[in-house]
From Swiss-Prot:
UniProt GO MF annotations: ATP binding; protein serine kinase activity; protein serine/threonine kinase activity
PANTHER family referenced in this protein's UniProt entry, alphabetically: OS01G0588500 PROTEIN-RELATED
Gene: CST
Quaternary structure and partners: Interacts with SOBIR1/EVR and RLK5/HAE.
GO cellular component: nucleus; plasma membrane
Sequence similarity: Belongs to the protein kinase superfamily. Ser/Thr protein kinase family.
GO biological process: negative regulation of floral organ abscission
Modified residues (Phosphothreonine): T253, T258
Protein name: Probable serine/threonine-protein kinase CST
UniProt entry keywords in alphabetical sequence: ATP-binding, Cell membrane, Kinase, Lipoprotein, Membrane, Myristate, Nucleotide-binding, Nucleus, Palmitate, Phosphoprotein, Serine/threonine-protein kinase, Transferase
Modification Phosphoserine occurs at: S117, S222
Amino acid sequence: MGACISFFSSSSPSKTGLHSHATTNNHSNGTEFSSTTGATTNSSVGQQSQFSDISTGIISDSGKLLESPNLKVYNFLDLKTATKNFKPDSMLGQGGFGKVYRGWVDATTLAPSRVGSGMIVAIKRLNSESVQGFAEWRSEVNFLGMLSHRNLVKLLGYCREDKELLLVYEFMPKGSLESHLFRRNDPFPWDLRIKIVIGAARGLAFLHSLQREVIYRDFKASNILLDSNYDAKLSDFGLAKLGPADEKSHVTTRIMGTYGYAAPEYMATGHLYVKSDVFAFGVVLLEIMTGLTAHNTKRPRGQESLVDWLRPELSNKHRVKQIMDKGIKGQYTTKVATEMARITLSCIEPDPKNRPHMKEVVEVLEHIQGLNVVPNRSSTKQAVANSSRSSPHHYRYKAGALGAERKRATPGRFGSVEK
């Protein structure tokens, strides 16, 4: 039988209803930490919404917190049909907690359809034996089922049947920012880089603007997905948390995330602030400036962390020119590079109190985008044309072996399952 999730409960609104008890398996080299104990496998889920203490219907920056979830409940047979029985040639990618397949559904009813008929969707089939897989599935349904914004990926439906856990998303044909940014010998044009981070910033600003803020906790280039127009949408809410309540400054939680992006205060103490997301956003800004990955153990000692390595260079406008990606030379002005360095440096401030709010970041980036008037944009136009010819898969969310610096490599998560 398929399962329908109860988002609301009459129990105390101070609890989230998320309970996972697990031991920790530690892995090195930035791969995911997982657990194998204690997952609930009943065919129905009765749990309180994480949004039970947020005012419903809040509209902010063209987004809203929905009064009730609008998700289609699929049975397992539906999704077997939509993916040709999960055949290997339908698989888009895989990770530590499951695999993602290309599927087909009716564009109007979202009912499963024959391959090649209707619209393409992305179907994530999670590993039901993993407690973390179950926790992430539940978190995605809770958050993406209740949040609507043009810069958040749309969750269309879900399935929980026996031990099967699946999620159905809109398909993002242009892949992820990561899949474009770190391609070898094919630099991604500056105009698209700035457009994409502005869209991502708007999505993050929306999460932070809710009456009870949502902390995304896993902001990184591989989680910024792109539609056919290169409009950015945040994906993967498996680690998202509600922000602090009752005028507290932070929430305390087990340390989970991705090396190179996690804020220093969170790594040191487990204290998670709304502005911990701002730090991660600053890391992505540094990535689009340099074309280098946030964390790479193949780099020389002292350069593994992009932030630790290049933070000192950002305050010197002459050095900023030296760290900019050589592949996009001529596509931006000196003023643009200097202003980008300034907002990036502000975002990666060691003290979260000194970081800007994401709404301010959006305004600054929009201003910078308007500054970028270069004499000759022919190289940019050609680069955009080259990018448009390729649509790399973006669902390979497991860390792989790192090769050369510009070789595509998704950083893996660290951390243990949360209680």
